[in-house]
Amino acid sequence: TEEVVPVAKELELCINYLHMQQVRFGEALTFSIDVSDTLQSGGKLPVYSIQLLAENAIKHNTLTREQPLHIRISGEKGTGKITVSNNMQPKLSIEDGNGVGLSNLAERYRLLGKPGLEISRGQGEFSVTIKVLTDEHPDN
């Protein structure tokens, strides 16, 4: 199986996943994507990395029509990074909430010899920023 895929393909996988989740949650889930075309065509990401971050947001937050969860995926070529952020509406209890998803993604970056994740929480928002891999990496 592929370890890394083009950013555009990874975004497509995540968009398909989010559309399926919108069928499930309806108006309780919204998302937006603003990733530059240059970044989409010029870099790669570990497979399912963006989807994992979107899943993480859905798993750890309450989604209601009155207070929808909004997932934002953004990235500019100048930064070489993609950020997945969401408004924080923490669930009171989380099944299997042991942080395996983020740890797994950080480990995948480590194995690729790249810096890990940048995680931030503040002002009602949670975000994870990941590095887009370029052709300087021998496996790309």
Which positions does each model-derived feature cover?
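Two-component histidine phosphotransfer core
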Residues: 1-131
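C-terminal end segment of the histidine kinase catalytic
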Residues: 135-140
